[in-house]
Amino acid sequence: MENSLKSSGKPLAAPKVGMVSLGCPKALVDSEQIITQLRAEGYEISGTYDGADLVVVNTCGFIDEAVQESLDAIGEALAENGKVIVTGCLGAKKSASGSGLIAEVHPKVLAVTGPHAVGEVMQAVHSHLPKPHDPFVDLVPAAGIKLTPRHYAYLKISEGCNHRCSFCIIPSMRGELVSRPVAEVMLEAENLFKSGVKELLVISQDTSAYGVDVKYRTGFWNGRPLKTRMTELVGALGELAAQYGAWVRLHYVYPYPHVDEIIPMMAQGPLKGHVLPYLDVPFQHAHPEVLKRMKRPANAERVLERVQKWREICPDLTIRSTFIAGFPGETDAQFETLLDFIREAELDRVGCFAYSPVEGASANALDGALPDDVREARRARFMEVAEEVSAARIARKVGKTLKVLIDEVNAEGGIGRTAADAPEIDGVVYVEPAAKASKRYKVGEFVSVKITGADGHDLWGEV
């Protein structure tokens, strides 16, 4: 069989991108990163306007002189080439009317982003100049290689942690908090939704701290500014999920004050049903003295008030948490305080570990280490109380009709999860076979299920 590529006599020419870089060394580094990504994807870099298929102009907007230089450079690129993408500091600058300055002065530009926006620039380049085919790289789907089922995926938004909890050594292994650029996060999320993902699980070591390390720097997504901050990210992910009829679930959410801003998104408006009413909050304990020894925030009363307020705003809210029983120095009274907290907070999903020393953790040096049997007894007692609370809450769902995402199909019908159930760690819904013999459930589809029974952490229902 003949190779069809031979008929052209030569390989297809790679698309060419011109680059104009203005401003400070930080802007120069951004330009280097853009060029590096372009080359990695198979684009060629043109040294002239007329030799380029489009031009990227990296601007400066620090002083008036730099603003004018940047506007002139954009105008020149438009005149000489006609296809221009603008990035850099001037991209974030507003005009006197409040609109984007660049779009007002040069309305023919293809796209505008702010500084440090490699992902956004590449998205714009792809839209106007599709990347060349690479027989090796193109074997990798845009969403990347995933080890989860096709219909759900984890989205890591940061690495590392700034906390110094005495029982934990994660910071020594993973380092300080490093937040991913918001455009990069959004692009990955979009690719995942496009690939068929119906549930996106947002993860990190500390989701609430997203953006702290970059002082909540403003990035760009789809031509609009977007803060590197949890509230804004969740809102943008929710909007994206709504476009694809999908869910966004939040994990590892420390109870910082701005978490309060997320709850209304779950309860009302266009994001309801997409930003799930579900929070995974690692409380770890409830007694202030124990929390102090753990080097954790130590205002349990305030936490309880906030949990109650969250539920007033969003009655369907599911709260998952993890705790440690038998921490060094924990007294009987302090343990009872923990049990009281579980009852009052009515946490839906709870995990508990008997304290165990971790090599390298500062808690190893604390006085008051408890015997193994005491630690295990407290863990078991804790889980008894937690399961009583959980069973009471889950029983309230009987008789309701809930939206269920199907994870598995078998002869007995289907197995899925509600908004209250994260994969692997929470309960499931056993769905009876469809009434019509011709109807079979599909993995990754949503179905409305009337709940007919509850047992432990799981539900039973029928369509």
From Swiss-Prot:
GO terms for biological process, alphabetical: tRNA modification
Cofactor binding notes: Binds 2 [4Fe-4S] clusters. One cluster is coordinated with 3 cysteines and an exchangeable S-adenosyl-L-methionine.
Binding-site residues for [4Fe-4S] cluster 2, renumbered to this chain: C161, C165, C168
Source taxon at top rank: Bacteria
Classification via HAMAP family: MTTase_RimO (MF_01865)
Signal peptide boundaries: none
GO cellular component, as recorded: cytosol
Claim: Iron is one of the keywords in the record: yes
Pfam family, one: UPF0004
Organism: Burkholderia pseudomallei (strain 1106a)
Catalysed transformations (reactions): L-aspartate(89)-[ribosomal protein uS12]-hydrogen + (sulfur carrier)-SH + AH2 + 2 S-adenosyl-L-methionine = 3-methylsulfanyl-L-aspartate(89)-[ribosomal protein uS12]-hydrogen + (sulfur carrier)-H + 5'-deoxyadenosine + L-methionine + A + S-adenosyl-L-homocysteine + 2 H(+)
InterPro entries: Elp3/MiaA/NifB-like_rSAM (IPR006638), Methylthiotransferase (IPR005839), Methylthiotransferase_CS (IPR020612), Methylthiotransferase_N (IPR013848), Methylthiotransferase_N_sf (IPR038135), NA-bd_OB-fold (IPR012340), Ribosomal_uS12_MeSTrfase_RimO (IPR005840), rSAM (IPR007197)
Residue stretches making up the TRAM domain: 395-463
Classification via PROSITE patterns: MTTASE_N, MTTASE_RADICAL, RADICAL_SAM, TRAM
Similarity remark: Belongs to the methylthiotransferase family. RimO subfamily.
Binding positions for [4Fe-4S] cluster 1 per the UniProt entry: C24, C60, C89
Radical SAM core domain: residues covered: 147-392
Presence of the UniProt keyword Membrane in the record: no
Residue span(s) of domain MTTase N-terminal: 15-130
Documented EC number(s): 2.8.4.4
GO molecular function: 4 iron, 4 sulfur cluster binding; aspartic acid methylthiotransferase activity; metal ion binding; protein methylthiotransferase activity
Cofactors required: [4Fe-4S] cluster
Biological function: Catalyzes the methylthiolation of an aspartic acid residue of ribosomal protein uS12.
Organism lineage string: Bacteria, Pseudomonadati, Pseudomonadota, Betaproteobacteria, Burkholderiales
Protein name: Ribosomal protein uS12 methylthiotransferase RimO
